[in-house]
Amino acid sequence: NNCPQDWLPMNGLCYKIFDELKAWKDAEMFCRKYKPGCHLASIILYGESPEWAEGHSEVWLGLWDKKKDFSWEWTDR
């Protein structure tokens, strides 16, 4: 486990929920500045229920429509 203290290790990655309210773009920029390689979370498997989101009613995910043409992409890919 190479995750920082208070981060949740899962499937070889590290997850952390931040409680500050932010717009989606601001949240993604916050993640990128927080630590190199960080992004909003991606859900890899269809129907995956990420345990890092349990107990939180609203979280941002890293899925976006960069080109504004309904071709959705994950920010970490």
UniProtKB/Swiss-Prot annotation:
Quaternary assembly: Homodimer; disulfide-linked.
**Which GO molecular function terms does the record list?**
carbohydrate binding; metal ion binding
- What InterPro entries does the annotation carry? C-type_lectin-like, C-type_lectin-like/link_sf, CTDL_fold
Tissue-level expression? Expressed by the venom gland.
Q: What does this protein do?
A: Lectin that displays hemagglutinating activity on all types of trypsinized human erythrocytes (A+, B+, AB+, and O+), with a higher sensitivity to AB+ type. Is inhibited by different carbohydrates with alpha-lactose displaying the most potent ability to block agglutination (followed by D-fucose, D-galactose, D-rhamnose, D-mannose, and D-sucrose). Is also inhibited by EDTA and pretreatment with heat. In addition, it induces significant cell death in HL-60 cells in a dose-dependent manner, with an IC(50) close to 250 ug/ml. Is a calcium-dependent lectin.
The Swiss-Prot or TrEMBL record describes its family as follows:
Belongs to the true venom lectin family.
GO cellular component terms, alphabetically, are: extracellular region
S-S pairs: 3-14
Put simply, this protein is called C-type lectin galatrox
Mind telling me which Gene3D superfamilies this protein's record contains? Answer: Mannose-Binding Protein A, subunit A
Q: What else is known?
A: Negative results: in contrast to B.atrox venom, does not induce edema in mouse paw nor does it induce mast cell degranulation (tested on RBL-2H3 cell line). Has no significant effect on plasma coagulation in vitro nor does it induce platelet aggregation.
Domain called C-type lectin: residue spans: 10-77
Keyword Metal-binding: yes or no?
yes
Q: What is its main location?
A: secreted
Indicate whether Metal-binding appears among the record's keywords: yes
The record lists the organism as Bothrops atrox (Barba amarilla)
Q: Where in the cell is it found?
A: Secreted
From the UniProt record, list the coiled-coil ranges: none
Keywords in alphabetical order: Calcium, Disulfide bond, Hemagglutinin, Lectin, Metal-binding, Secreted
